[in-house]
Amino acid sequence: MTIGILPEYALLEMFGFYVDEAQAVEEAQTEDDTQAVDNARDIEKWHTLVHVCRQWRYVVFASPRRLKLRLLCTDRRPVREMLCIWPATLPIVIWSNHRPISLMDGVDNIIAALEHPDRVCRIDLRSVPSSLLERLADLMQRPFPALEYLELRTENEAAPDVSDSFLGGPAPHLRSLLLKTVPFPALQKLLLSASHLVRLNLWNIPHTLYTTPEAMIACLSSLPKLETLRLGFRSPRPHLNLTNGPLPQPRTELPFLTSLRFLGDSEYLEDLVAWITAPLLNTVKITFFDQPVFEISHLPRFISRAEKLNALNQIDLMFDSRSVAATLSPQSGEANCPRLRLEISSTESDWQLSSLVQVCRQSLPTLSTLKRLDIREGQYPRPRWQDNNEEDAHWLVLLQLFTAVEDLHLSKRLALHVAPALQDLAEERAAVVLPALQNVFIERLPPTGIIRRAIKQFAAARQRLDRPITIKRRKRE
């Protein structure tokens, strides 16, 4: 049998599988800037099919919904000519190539596509100059009834406000919204009308658009289908006073939320998660701005209400010149496994250690279940370590949190600081710090030197307490 004698329904099923696979890749790449070009190409997979033969072309255009046909309009294409060639029923995707200069040169093509608001299903414009953002926003002061995906990004922190009449009011079919550095005062009004929203990403939020936790919770309560939430503030907000307003009763449940990303002050997050339940939460990444004192009580309760985040049994502590982070995950290491990451923006090593102790102690309900502890440096240059008794004390306070850890993995650089801190422990304290420890793995452990002497002295103290440990050399991962 040759493919030419297949019935049309069989061809349609084959084409549907082909396009569905492309769409799955597209959705997976939605949040990844580096994949933007491939993402756009995936939208046009159907072009290959219609150019094979007349029969295939007929099958494709006879089933535009089943095959999710869309017309890709960019700043570098003659959009007006394209609109005359292809069927007028095809939904329009507006996409920029993410280069501001090219986008300015090709703005007429973007405008030509925006002139068909009833057909536009997706708008993806990144690195938009502020002057162009204002112009495009003015062109979008009308309803876009088919719009499902909207992404606007500008790098200009002085970008003008987007008008309250943006999109002409409600956006009932909107499924994904990403705004980066885009000042949109009427955002709350838009969110309250977008009940089908699945992904919400508000990043680099300026102080002029500050939304109280109470108002944000009210918006989230109107988004029952939300799966991904990302909130990122531009900088710490001075003189925080977030708890005076009335909070909602009862707690808002987000039954489909699986991913949460937050960048901001701990006080804001506390007031937010105190009134949210997300039982299917699978991935959490939280970055706190540097602050002297962390007062966290609602976050661990929020985490404990997510079943998948209560089965994490290993923790990775990463230090670099910009931040310190603690990442919890299962030891299985499977793809798409549950993951909880807490990060603190801090540069000084002693401050990193003391902040990490505060956040881990207050935020992590599963400390007593962790079996593996990794301590390593990050991709940026290491922080400025002090190498003094005060820093040793900080290390010991941190390690004392992990009462169930059996395996300790140290990178070579961090072993230079952790091992000396363990070296001079009195025997009674050697039983308190990492009491369940059985194995120490040190990256490229030399046969002699500071690290070897320090860790051997700690091992001897544990041996006298009848709590022996094994020292092993670990290859660099």
Feature roles, as predicted:
Residues 1-477:
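Leucine-rich repeat
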